[in-house]
Design a protein with these regions (language model features):
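Active-site-proximal loop/hinge segments that shape catalytic or ion-binding/gating pockets
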Residues: 1-81, 87-214
């Protein structure tokens, strides 16, 4: 466990690499539950009988459900996943599948990384490329230039390493309390209108067309 004296250092590492928030992509239909209960892991949602509009690929969800994390004794689906860079291959897939108008990106305070038991990966946690890190100080080892890349394809060639590293994750055990949610990001004013009555001014809503794919 990192020394409490060093607790601010990991957040500084993120800020110095252009990361102001941690992100989770979800369907707008899930907002009501998230605003009420916080953001829950897939397994905790199942345990509590919460209806969830799933956006992830079934095969990948099953793989994450079987992936046991080193040392913790828990599986990936026992954790809530957040991205450092939300405009990644996962975002591309779900935008093509559901249309960006139906999606919302949740932006969380960086203080989330201080929640006990939080784990970090330097690539998509379900991929064979991922390394798992249990100390916040190890964020210094991450290749932030690649993680913060704008694209994973150049000249028609897809670079697998870049694609996977852009999906590096923060894994929070079971639940992220509502207090850490700082803003909701939609792709259009039309989408904002869809969720305004639900949010009731309790969370900032922002429009960012460039975060989504079309």
């Amino acid at each position: 466990m990192d020394s409490p004296i060093l607790r601010k250092a990991p957040i500084q590492i993120l800020k110095e690499n252009g990361i102001d928030y941690l992100y989770h992509i979800t369907h707008k239909k899930n907002l009501k539950s998230i605003l009420r209960f916080g953001l829950l892991s897939r397994n905790l949602c199942i345990e509590k009988g919460l209806a969830v509009e799933e956006i992830g690929d079934t095969e990948i969800k099953e793989r994450r459900g079987m992936t046991m994390l080193p040392y913790s004794g828990l599986r990936l689906n026992d954790y809530v996943p957040l991205y450092f860079n939300p405009r990644n291959a996962m975002m591309y897939k779900v935008c093509k599948r559901f249309n960006a108008n139906n999606l919302v990106v949740l932006a969380y305070d960086l203080m989330v990384i201080l929640i006990s038991g939080t784990i970090f990966t330097d690539a998509n946690a379900a991929s064979v490329d991922a390394n798992f890190y249990y100390r916040k100080s190890e964020l210094e080892k991450f290749d932030w230039k690649i993680i913060q890349s704008k694209d994973w394809s150049f000249g028609g060639i897809t670079f697998r390493e870049i694609k996977q590293k852009m999906m590096a994750e923060v894994l929070v055990k079971e639940r992220i309390p509502r207090k850490y949610l700082k803003k909701l990001i939609c792709n259009s004013l039309e989408s904002v209108e869809d969720i305004k009555s639900l949010v009731k001014g309790k969370v900032e809503i922002e429009v960012s067309e460039g975060m989504f794919f079309y």
